[in-house]
From Swiss-Prot:
Similarity comment text for this entry: Belongs to the TrpR family.
Principal cellular location given in the protein's record: cytoplasm
Entry protein name: Trp operon repressor
Organism, as annotated: Klebsiella pneumoniae (strain 342)
Compartments, record wording: Cytoplasm
GO biological process, one term: negative regulation of DNA-templated transcription
One GO CC term on file: cytoplasm
Single annotated GO MF: sequence-specific DNA binding
Superkingdom of source: Bacteria
High-level lineage: Bacteria, Pseudomonadati, Pseudomonadota, Gammaproteobacteria, Enterobacterales
DNA-binding region: 68-91
Subunit-structure text: Homodimer.
Cited function: This protein is an aporepressor. When complexed with L-tryptophan it binds the operator region of the trp operon (5'-ACTAGT-'3') and prevents the initiation of transcription. The complex also regulates trp repressor biosynthesis by binding to its regulatory region.
Amino acid sequence: MTQQSPYSAAVAEQRHQEWLRFVALLQQAYAEDLHLPLLQLMLTPDEREALGTRVRIIEELLRGEMSQRELKNELGAGIATITRGSNSLKSAPAELRQWLEQTLLTSDK
C-alpha cells in the first residue's frame, strides 16, 4: 500500500469534501437550532476564541480606522494572522465583502 503525499490532488479533494460535509452539517444544525452545541463539540475553546478574533480583525479591516499594527496591539493577534485576514478580504468576492460590511458594520453589537 502506497502512502499518499499530504499535498496530492486526491488528498486535497478528500479534504475539500470533508469541509463541505462539515458545512452541510452546520447548515442542518442551524436549521434545527443545534448550531451552538455542535460548534462547542467540534471546536476547542481556543479555536472558538480564534474565530471570534478573526471576526474582529475582518470587522476592523472593513472599518479601515486602524493600521494592522494597531490591530495587532488591540486584539493581541499576530501580525501574520492580521495580514492573512487582509489578504483574504482583498480576494473575497464582492458580494461577500458587501454582506460583511452590512452585517458587521451596520448591525448592533
